[in-house]
Amino acid sequence: MENNKNQWLEIGTIVSARGLKGELKVLSSTDFPERFEIPGKRWLQPPHDPYPQAIELISGKSVAGKNIYIVRLEGIENRNQAETLRGYKLLIMDQELPELEEEEYHVSQLINVQVYHHKTGELLGTVIDLFTTGHDLLEIQLINNSEREAKKTKERKVLIPFVYEIVPVVDLENNRIEINPPKGLLSLGDS
């Protein structure tokens, strides 16, 4: 199968083995529990390897109060086998993505979208990640826009609350997000 980054969606990362019978603890990166609870085909991607391998999800259940699922995968029968999968990503094909409501987005759609200041039109940076907490946060890699900043070796990143008041425009067709950053927010990337 051709490996195209856009055809895969990460749903979690295997963080450890659980018990002696091959169960795995998976840190979820999805808001859809059925991706762990409904058996079927998933893909495993080893660290530093762009080529996922198909595997069957046998079962999965959430750990109460945590963003962790305990899953069973076909062919993983003991703790030693489970331990070898630490750090692997669990993926689904993007054709399996659920339909979203208006103004809902999949994380993979937002990564690498350019971020502009809503009022000035100035290019500010690029979305590099999204953190799902109480309120979603966009992580933005800021561009260097002055000689002083260009001399800094440290990358400048900021977290922007992904709420309409701060992010009024998401235009995926044009690879553009516009933000109204509160005063001082962008300078936080300097520290």
From Swiss-Prot:
Reading the lineage from the top rank, the first entry is Bacteria
Q: Name one GO molecular function term.
A: ribosome binding
Main localization is: cytoplasm
Task: State the compartments where it is located.
Answer: Cytoplasm
Q: Name one GO biological process term.
A: ribosomal small subunit biogenesis
Domain remark from Swiss-Prot or TrEMBL? The PRC barrel domain binds ribosomal protein uS19.
**Family matches, as NCBIfam families:** 16S_RimM
Subunit field text: Binds ribosomal protein uS19.
- The protein's name: Ribosome maturation factor RimM
Could you tell me which species this protein originates from? Crocosphaera subtropica (strain ATCC 51142 / BH68) (Cyanothece sp. (strain ATCC 51142))
The lineage, from the top, is:
Bacteria, Bacillati, Cyanobacteriota, Cyanophyceae, Oscillatoriophycideae
